[in-house]
Amino acid sequence: MACMRIYISGPISGQDRIRTVDRFNNTARIIEEAGHRAINPINIAGWGLEWSTYMQIAFDVLQSGEVDMVYMLSGWEESTGASLERYMAIIKGIPVEYQSAEDRKQYKANGGSNGKV
């Protein structure tokens, strides 16, 4: 399998900093151990920016043509930012995969890996 560039999406704003950074970094490590390149938004943007700045950075990355897949961490549906990243991926035709088995089942049943908006 070719090396894919996988953008990690999930709740960040309003979350515990240490747990969130660990969660994203652990996910990135798993992706990289599988031979892919992880695109970790926390490493790109850091911590403590305004929400709108984070979203502009995320949209720029997703529109860059440098993302082959978006990986949605569990709890994404509770996050406006992660939901918008998912929507942007769907619009751009970027495949979306889900950490949660329940999400994978629900969204694949509704039209493939991109699910429904």
What annotation goes with each model-predicted range?
Residues 1-117:
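Conserved catalytic or regulatory cores that recognize and/or transform ribose-phosphate-containing ligands
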